[in-house]
Amino acid sequence: MEDLDFPICILKMNLQCCEDFPSRVKKLLRQVKGVYAITIDPVKGLILVCGTAEPSVLIKAVAKLGQSPQLYAYEKDPATAKTRFRTLLKRYATNKTQDKPSPPAPPVTATTPVETCPAGGETFRGFGYPGPTTMMQMPAFSLPPPRGLPGWLAPPTNPRLKYEEPKVTPRKPPAPYPFDYYENLGFPPSDSLFNYFSDDNPQPCSIM
């Protein structure tokens, strides 16, 4: 990185949430246009980027993993950037010799909260387990409150109407007409000579 004549941007964030988180950050920054060199220090939580990309673009790219990094330093002049970069490396080398070994981490139990990585990893619990504060939490789903019977089984509020059968009116008996009322009487007898002597004529003429 010291051989490149480009601005240097230093971002600071937590890189020890999981083992492969630094490699994911580096892989994501390589896709940003204008980035030519990347140096990551997971212990100190520093990301050193050399290139022409703006710090806001780098912060926005890293924020896709679930954590938003802070802008620690930015030097646009390449000559001044090299000097500040060498000074920063010397200061870190001095601090590493003075650092004491940290005590071993306590064993993880059921009551000990496990630090999870926003981008996934070995310690990522999955759905239903608590995640980091910067990660979007899933809403808690619960059963709906108990209710009464559904509408088609619940008793009606208004009393039902009593069903009544329609009244059937009996037919009237026929009127007492004479027996031969519906018979065909035929045409009246014609006034002819044959009718005078016919047996069907109630008033025939008889020859004496």
Swiss-Prot record:
List of residues that carry Cysteine methyl ester: 205
Chain segments carrying region Disordered: 93-116
Q: Which CDD domains match?
A: HMA
| Keyword terms of this UniProt record | Lipoprotein, Metal-binding, Methylation, Prenylation
| Lipid attachment locations (S-farnesyl cysteine) | 205
Q: Which domain of life does this protein belong to? A: Eukaryota
What positions belong to the pro-peptide in this record? 206-208
- Can you give the residue ranges of the HMA domain? 6-70
List the GO molecular function terms.
metal ion binding
Instruction: Report the function annotation for this chain.
Output: Probable heavy-metal-binding protein.
Family per similarity comment: Belongs to the HIPP family.
Q: What is this protein called?
A: Heavy metal-associated isoprenylated plant protein 42
The species this protein belongs to is: Arabidopsis thaliana
Q: Which gene encodes it?
A: HIPP42
